[in-house]
A protein has these predicted regions:
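Nucleotide-sugar donor-binding/catalytic module of glycosyltransferases
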Residues: 1-117
Length: 117
């Protein structure tokens, strides 16, 4: 498989503890594995951090940060973007899933056709 460079996956979250595990697992199941997952919490009122913590401990590519105050979706995404180290940026909400070959197919298409994320 080609290496297209690091993909920074931005996952904004707010009170998605019941769903975020499946989201994380769908990222870990990607056939393209050169990624970092930046979970940016907008001051969740549930146990999102406790749910995410075991994934961070097992996979150093998963990083979590919480906004200082509840700020809304745009600020939350922008805060994560400032931390991104990847050549590519992808967004995945914390209650959504990706098919296993999503990144691989998308990157291949974009590189072959001269597109950017």
């Amino acid at each position: 498989m080609d290496d297209y460079g690091l993909v920074s996956i931005i996952t904004p979250t707010w009170a998605c503890a019941p769903f975020i595990c499946e989201t994380i697992r769908s990222i870990q199941a990607q056939t393209y594995q050169n990624w970092e997952l930046l979970i940016q919490d907008d001051c969740s009122t549930d146990n999102t951090l406790e749910v995410v913590r075991p994934y961070m401990e097992m996979d150093s590519r998963i990083k979590y940060e919480c906004n200082p105050t509840n700020s809304g979706a745009a600020v939350t995404r922008n805060n994560a973007l400032r931390r991104a180290k990847g050549r590519w940026i992808a967004f995945l909400d914390s209650d959504d899933l990706w098919m296993p070959e999503k990144l691989e197919h998308q990157l291949k298409f974009m590189v072959e056709n001269g597109y950017a994320f």
